[in-house]
Amino acid sequence: MAKKTVRDIDVKGKRVLLRVDFNVPMENGRVADDVKIKEAVPTINYLIGQKARVILVSHLGRPKGRVDERYKMDPVARRLSELLGKTVVKAGDCVGEAARSAVAQMQDGDVVLLENVRFHPEEEKNDEKFARQLAELADVFVNDAFGTAHRAHASTEGVAGFLPAVAGLLMEKELEILGRLLTSPERPFAAVVGGSKVSDKLGVIFNLLTKVDTVIIGGGMANTFLKAQGYSVGKSLLEADKIDLARKLIAEARSREVKLLLPVDVVVAPGPAPGQEQRTVPVDQIPAEWMALDIGPESIRLFTEALRAARTVVWNGPMGVFEMDPFARGTEAIARTLAELNAVTVIGGGDTAAAAKKAGVAGKMTHISTGGGASLEFLEGKQLPGVRALLDK
């Protein structure tokens, strides 16, 4: 169901509570990476242009429901001011007198950033009274925080019970691009799934089996699938309680005639640390005391060949311990291959985005999702609470 967006309503002179995802990394009291802030700028600028009063609310870090100096929003307000080229007033709190008085002094086109919403334990409990206090600051609620749309929190879902709620421009873009993957992808459609844990991704793979032509599995999670096929994986990361599910998934892929590709060779070492001896072995020769830490050159060849035929690719999760150069080749090869494709390429998840950035090809992707967990749940076919709460068109 298509959701109403900020373009579908009149916001002139209105107080607009805009939920953004400003959960950015900090270093020495400065914003270390401002990508998430930049992603919100189009919606903020649209609202300023429409002469709305823009009240921003976000969380930052995990302050555990109490005030924590390290997670105050002041550095974010400073960086946002620079990006917008105008003053952003930082309120002393997100509810109560400090928030109310900051909002009361606003003129049309002004921007106020409320203090970290997670300084209050009620936020993550989706407390109704707290949601009402947030809602009382505004006339309209706009959710532009796709990254937290899978959380039913007061500032993502609760507040929508008290105000007309619509999607921001970033939220709209995410829902449109990810939605198209599930409903009308250009074929052949391939999914590349990696990362360390099968448990995080099983639901996604099962759902994607009904949509895709090819599934490529790498990273630590591939070990569980290799074990399910009878291979010994040495000391590699393994989720023994998921082996039966992996078997089921392999059978399901076969019955749906989806091509399922697993590594045929791996880079092994005694452990995930640099400077150790390492070698490449076929998957049936992983030494008993060693770990598989990346896909090998034959797997890279197999995977990239399959991807070259694709017209749509969704990628979530690295192929190995890509943070360490000796084990980054598989992930970087996938990133470079996607960058060269004449296809729709969508990346979900923080690690995968970081890997594309490390390979220097982030700008060549069609779309890098701003929501790791949210994009996974969306691709799993789940309804996201923060999206469900918005008005339908």
UniProtKB/Swiss-Prot annotation:
EC number: 2.7.2.3
Keyword Ribonucleoprotein: no
Record: residues binding substrate: D21, F22, N23, H59, L60, G61, R62, R118, R151
Gene (UniProt): pgk
Protein's recorded name: Phosphoglycerate kinase
Native source organism of the sequence: Pelotomaculum thermopropionicum (strain DSM 13744 / JCM 10971 / SI)
InterPro entries: Phosphoglycerate_kinase, Phosphoglycerate_kinase_CS, Phosphoglycerate_kinase_N, Phosphoglycerate_kinase_sf
Family, per entry: Belongs to the phosphoglycerate kinase family.
Stored PANTHER family: PHOSPHOGLYCERATE KINASE, PHOSPHOGLYCERATE KINASE 1, CHLOROPLASTIC-RELATED
